A protein has these predicted regions:
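Phosphate/dinucleotide-binding and metal-coordinating scaffold of catalytic cores
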Residues: 2
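Metal-dependent phosphoesterase core characteristic of DEDDh/y 3'-5' exonuclease domains
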Residues: 5-6, 22-25, 31-33, 37-63, ...
C-alpha cells in the first residue's frame, strides 16, 4: 500500500433515484487514512439546478432539500463536478461510500459525462480505486458476523440499511438523509468492522 494512501468517503443526496436522468442536490465527503481516522477538512457542496430539470417531489420530501435551497447555497454543476473531481483524483485515493457502486458512483459518472469530464479516469488513474462498504458489511454478516449488532426487518430478514445498522450499534446518525451525516455514519461503521475483524484475528 502506498504511504500516502487515503480513503475519500462520500455520499450524495439527489432529486431522484435514477442516476442517468436525475440530478445531484448535495455532496459530502471526508478524507481518512487507512485506519479511517479523519485527515482532511470535510467537503460539503450543493448543486444549483437548471431550469430544464424537474425534481421528484418524493425526493424533496425524503431529504428535506429543496431546489430553492440548492440554488441559494449551491454552485453551478460544472463547478460542482470540478470540485468533486479534485478530491477524487488525488493520487492513491480509494473512493468509498455505502452503496456507492450501485448508486453514488453512477451519479458521479453521469454528472461528469454531462460536464465533459472523463467519467472513469478518477477511479483508476494514479493508483486510485473505488470500494463499497455495503458489500463488506454483507460479507461480514455471511462469513464473520461477530462484533456487530445486526438489524432485521419485520419479516426476520437481515437489513443492511445504514440507518438501521447505525441504530443497532449505537452509532450517532440523527439525520439519515443528510449527505454529511451519512458520511460520518459510514466512517463509524468502517471503524466498527475494522475493530471487530482485528479482535477476531487475535482470537484465532
Amino acid at each position: 500500500m502506498a504511504t500516502d494512501f487515503s480513503f475519500f468517503i462520500y455520499d450524495y443526496e439527489s432529486f431522484g433515484i435514477n442516476p442517468a436522468s436525475d440530478r445531484p442536490a448535495q455532496f459530502a465527503g471526508i478524507r481518512t487514512d487507512a485506519d479511517f481516522n479523519i485527515i482532511g477538512e470535510p467537503v460539503m457542496l450543493y448543486c444549483k439546478q437548471t431550469n430544464d430539470y424537474l425534481p421528484a417531489p418524493e425526493a424533496v420530501m425524503v431529504t428535506g432539500i429543496t431546489p430553492q435551497e440548492c440554488n441559494e447555497k449551491g454552485i453551478s454543476e460544472p463547478e460542482f463536478s470540478a470540485k468533486i473531481l479534485a478530491e477524487f483524483s488525488q493520487p492513491n485515493t480509494c473512493v468509498m461510500g455505502y452503496n456507492n457502486i450501485r448508486y453514488d458512483d453512477e451519479m458521479t459518472r453521469y454528472t461528469f459525462y454531462r460536464n465533459f469530464i472523463d467519467p472513469y479516469e478518477y477511479s483508476w488513474k494514479n493508483g486510485n480505486s473505488r470500494w463499497d462498504l455495503l458489500d463488506v458489511v454483507r460479507a461480514c454478516y455471511a462469513l464473520r458476523p461477530e462484533g456487530i449488532n445486526w438489524a432485521y426487518d419485520d419479516d426476520g430478514m437481515p437489513s443492511f440499511r445504514l440507518e438501521k445498522l447505525t441504530k443497532a450499534n449505537g452509532i450517532e446518525h440523527e439525520n439519515a438523509h443528510d449527505a454529511m451525516a451519512d458520511v460520518y455514519a459510514t466512517i463509524a461503521m468502517a471503524k466498527l468492522i475494522k475493530i471487530g475483524r482485528a479482535s477476531c484475528r487475535e482470537r484465532v
